[in-house]
């Protein structure tokens, strides 16, 4: 599979709140895009936390081993990680991120999504 990712700050924002990650492992493919909530504090931090949470899961499991439940737990854990970080840093209060991901193995794909993007 050939894949490419790129983010762009756009014409309105002062910071790029987009984060993305993609990898091929053991014949499987995983990709995730996270977009910090515009107008809130720390959108770029929130989206990077989502990506780091996904990378942590993939350090333990191949995309071919991920279940729907794993994807659900990943998104819930990412949310907890974002909220925990916001609780520890007043400047990040209210931060959040959307996330869209896909895990592909053979002819099976599992898609996860949270947010309004």
Language-model segment annotations:
Residues 1-117:
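PP2C/PPM-type serine/threonine phosphatase catalytic domain
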């Amino acid at each position: 599979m050939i894949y490419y990712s790129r983010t762009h700050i756009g014409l309105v924002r002062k910071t790029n709140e987009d984060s993305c990650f993609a990898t091929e492992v053991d014949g499987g493919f995983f990709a995730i895009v996270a977009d910090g909530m515009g107008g809130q504090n720390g959108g770029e931090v929130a989206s990077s936390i989502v990506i780091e949470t996904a990378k942590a899961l993939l350090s333990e499991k191949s995309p071919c081993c991920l279940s729907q439940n794993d994807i659900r737990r990943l998104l819930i854990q990412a949310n907890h990680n974002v909220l925990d970080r916001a609780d520890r840093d007043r400047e990040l209060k209210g931060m959040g991120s959307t996330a869209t991901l896909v895990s592909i193995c053979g002819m099976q794909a599992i898609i996860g999504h949270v947010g309004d993007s």
